[in-house]
């Protein structure tokens, strides 16, 4: 049966490396061509929305509410046009971010009302949810240092430290109350993080991989 696996985390948490480890581990189990997605984005229209969220507009500031709505509009496109059809066709899906990012960044970081965030999720996704989320937990200071070392920061990456501290608090709140979320200490050295991801995924696949 097809599954939907999501990698989550703050900027600089190592999501791209985690995704590579997940794909390699799945391949060892004969799952060789999962559909990969990213949020925001993943469809032609959703990528346009991603550009607005990431870069803004030179002539007009993007309000927090507009940002929230763009993110959920992009998610609706991706889930409806890519993720659900892929799963229905029997394909596994590995996603770089999903709804938990909005709950953390917009709910925690931006401070949107919890009821509003729950309503947005319910309205756009219904009961659709990932089978497994691997949350890469990292101290925001370290994460931002890593992100800065990659080069020019986008609109979100330029947010102040307290934004990411609030986002991390919300991430951890969800992770500590949802058995489908596995937390990885992403502040460790690369080899240790890699081993942790593979070990956690192997355990999960042993009981959920069929």
Swiss-Prot record:
Reaction it catalyzes: dTMP + ATP = dTDP + ADP
Top EC class for this record: transferase
Listed GO CC annotations: cytosol
Name of the featured protein: Thymidylate kinase
Any Pfam family: Thymidylate_kin
Function statement: Phosphorylation of dTMP to form dTDP in both de novo and salvage pathways of dTTP synthesis.
Entry EC no(s): 2.7.4.9
Protein source organism: Aliivibrio salmonicida (strain LFI1238)
Annotated ATP binding sites: 9-16
One GO BP annotation of this record: dTDP biosynthetic process
Keyword vocabulary terms for this entry: ATP-binding, Kinase, Nucleotide biosynthesis, Nucleotide-binding, Transferase
Protein family membership: Belongs to the thymidylate kinase family.
HAMAP family linked to this entry: Thymidylate_kinase
PROSITE patterns for this protein: THYMIDYLATE_KINASE
Region forming the signal peptide: none
CDD domains: TMPK (cd01672)
GO MF, any single term: ATP binding
InterPro entries reported in the protein's UniProt record: P-loop_NTPase, Thymidylate_kin-like_dom, Thymidylate_kin_CS, Thymidylate_kinase
